[in-house]
Amino acid sequence: MLQRQVEPELMNATDQVEAYAAADFSQSDQALVEWIAQRFPMGLGDRVIDLGCGPGNIALLLVQRWQQIEVVGVDGAPKMLAVAKARGQALGSDQARRLSWQQSCLPDPTLPVGFTAAVSNSLLHHLHEPGVLWESIKQVAAPGCVVVIHDLRRPNSEEELQQLVERHAATAPPVLKRDYEASLRAAFSAKEVQQQLLQAQLPQLKVMEREDRYLTVWGQLA
């Protein structure tokens, strides 16, 4: 197994923000939302927090997929949030009014609480101390909160890493290709995440390896 190499926790450089805003992640983002819908056919309740929302990709899809929910997107990078806000305002008025945004870095004791669902896409690998994510989820969750944390998983070898970069980012702009490789190096293995959950006293959450590069943590709190 490759040794983990951390990367910067925030993505706020102008070239990064512009590249991620312009990139088309719609297929994988929509697939994640549909996976959530299949796993939780009763829905996500009425208040969802998207931790590390970036430019708002998942938050926007959530308010379109479930007509009754309100979503709070949280991110530490102000330039990413500016893109998310603009995208939200471009939606229809009903969907736009169910979106709100908060600039925050974890851990943050001032985060709103009482959420019926907590989701996150590609935040975990950015965190130098991953435990802050699991503690933050416990902090913001209402009883019975649905949890879905989706992220990359670290490859076993340098050879496997380079194969993934060429398979999934060969034609991407240089900044995205560079960041993708760095993210794979910073990601956790499924075994490491399982250990994190035990340390956080969240044994009810499951860890699933998906496709050739992802892991998803999912479940429902007591």
Language-model features: where?
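Conserved beta-strand signature within the Rossmann-like core of class I S-adenosyl-L-methionine
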Residues: C145-D151
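A short glycine-rich, Lys/Arg-flanked "PGG" loop and its adjoining helix->strand segment in the class I
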Residues: W134-P143
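A conserved beta-strand element that flanks and buttresses the S-adenosyl-L-methionine
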Residues: V119
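Conserved alpha-helix/loop element of class I SAM-dependent methyltransferases that forms part
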Residues: S26-D46
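N-terminal, positively charged/glycine-rich alpha-helical extensions of SAM-dependent methyltransferases
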Residues: M1-E18
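Class I SAM-dependent methyltransferase SAM/SAH-binding core
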Residues: I49, N57-D108
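C-terminal alpha-helical "lid/dimerization" subdomain adjacent to the S-adenosyl-L-methionine
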Residues: L152-L202, K206-M208
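Conserved glycine-rich SAM-binding loop
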Residues: G54
